Amino acid sequence: MLIVTGMSGAGKSVALHTLEDLGYYCVDNLPLILLDAFVRDFAQHHAQPVAVAIDARNAQDISALSDKLQTMKSVTRIQILFLNAQTNVLARRFSESRRPHPLRNFGSEQIIEAIEKERKLLGSLNNIADMLIDTSNYRAADLRQQLMQLLNTTAPHLLITLQSFGFKHGIPVNADFVFDVRFLPNPYWEARLRAFNGKEQPIIDWLEQFAEPRQFAQETAHYLQHWLSYFTGQNNRAYLNIAIGCTGGQHRSVFIAESVGAILRQDFPDLHIEHRDIEKN
């Protein structure tokens, strides 16, 4: 079990989202009175790793929490992650987000005073933490990378969906990339081929007699192979939708989606291919 705590504004939400992506069962702001029972239940009945976020909203119980966690560590494998940042950085983040600090008394207290009050309140947890991260100079992506390094994990696999479609039926609203293959030779104008689709051999054989379809599929796949790593490495994307469109979504886009997918599966074996409009014509 991982206890995620630290200063408000230091990145607990980013940490929890990262942990969820890594397969953790995450609980935010669990009342401390329920912590013992929660730990016992998960230790006995669940193999999934769990992360519990605790912050200053539990102020009345924080003073006794460090002793409780020390006791629990003797019987359960618990690690404590403490997120910190400089006071001026936290104040700026609250100003930019326009969110109230959980300990701020609006009648008499300034944000700096609330931050220092929280820092003092959480001092005992800071002292017993197994992992300390200062996020003063971090972007969200930096915190995510640092957390994965500390936990000795890698980024989750990018889930890629290749979708063929017909422009006359509309571009998929969830597409991250859109490729237009209406410039390719069109088997629709061959009456004997019209009833087939791009997964069937008559269409495959007809399109492969031209250089352009195979060349476009190969070059598009190589382009994607090069740039997709940036979506996991820098942008931390969990999924990506690639749409390939022709006029009706039955022939050319289906063939290209299957061809590109066959190449990309060498690096992304879980890639999913779907043909949205293959039955609409």
UniProtKB/Swiss-Prot annotation:
Q: Which SUPFAM superfamilies match?
A: P-loop containing nucleoside triphosphate hydrolases
Q: What does this protein do?
A: Displays ATPase and GTPase activities.
Q: What is this protein called?
A: Nucleotide-binding protein DNO_0399
Give the originating organism: Dichelobacter nodosus (strain VCS1703A)
Binding residues for GTP, per the UniProt record? 55-58
Kindly list the organism's lineage.
Bacteria, Pseudomonadati, Pseudomonadota, Gammaproteobacteria, Cardiobacteriales
Q: What superkingdom heads the lineage?
A: Bacteria
Checking Pfam families in the record gives:
PapZ_C, RapZ-like_N
> What UniProt keywords are attached to this protein's entry?
ATP-binding, GTP-binding, Nucleotide-binding
Q: Which GO terms describe its molecular function?
A: ATP binding; GTP binding
